[in-house]
Amino acid sequence: MLSRRIIPCLDVNAGRVVKGVRFQQLRDAGDPVACARAYDAQGADELIFLDITASSDERKIMHDVVAATAEQCFMPLTVGGGLRTVADIETMLKAGADKVSLNTAAIKNPQLIADAAERFGVQCIVVAIDAKREPDGQSWRVYTHGGRNPTELDAIAWARRAVELGAGEILLTSMDRDGTGDGYDLELTRGVSDAVSVPVIASGGAGTLQHLADVLDQGHASAVLAASIFHFGTYTIAQAKAFLGQRGVPVRS
């Protein structure tokens, strides 16, 4: 069985790492370069850097901050937020990113996924999906622009389509659970994981180490993303790996 990855996420707003609850009430969590250095030292498997207001502000991602973060980061780095063209993606890869995360732009122009995958390889292309449970409780709607704008897309159907177009990985965030510490949306994660043939990174809701184990087991996720529990010192990466390892989850040492 492939090792399960533990991935801290840097949500960056105006050059600072922030963390909110359900995409609101942002708290400052530090300098992105310092955070990247710390997570590298702690042994994180990968790092995700998301410029969370680049799409809603209709501006480019902060190249200099990404480049400085990549310099301190010797694990795989995924960068997302405000990437709209193949040229934007190339700029980020040249700045030091190993993978790029596409969200709003991929929904506006799904061909971008195919074009980027053809140019850089599917292993480079992560499609991020921000999903909120519908009132019927049985489905999840996709949102864009940092969770601000609802679409007509169903999360599971969109994940399937994104993979058909060339996504090599899905970054799946439950907007209902984001920052709550109440645990991941296991139903949503399992629904998407079982629908696609590529790895799914579960995001939104980690509050305890048991939550990580639950979404890997019951949610069928390939990797877990967490922010609050690592940024604010509740747990370390090493503690997370030890906890999972003791429960028979294969993790990288």
Swiss-Prot record:
Keyword Cytoplasm: yes
Catalyzed reactions: 5-[(5-phospho-1-deoxy-D-ribulos-1-ylimino)methylamino]-1-(5-phospho-beta-D-ribosyl)imidazole-4-carboxamide + L-glutamine = D-erythro-1-(imidazol-4-yl)glycerol 3-phosphate + 5-amino-1-(5-phospho-beta-D-ribosyl)imidazole-4-carboxamide + L-glutamate + H(+)
Major subcellular location class: cytoplasm
Alphabetical GO biological process terms: L-histidine biosynthetic process
Alphabetized InterPro entries for the sequence: Aldolase_TIM (IPR013785), Glycosyl_amidation-assoc_WbuZ (IPR020021), His_biosynth (IPR006062), HisF (IPR004651), IGPS_HisA/HisF (IPR050064), RibuloseP-bd_barrel (IPR011060)
NCBIfam families referenced in this protein's UniProt entry, alphabetically: hisF, WbuZ
Subunit structure as annotated in this protein's UniProt entry: Heterodimer of HisH and HisF.
Name of protein: Imidazole glycerol phosphate synthase subunit HisF
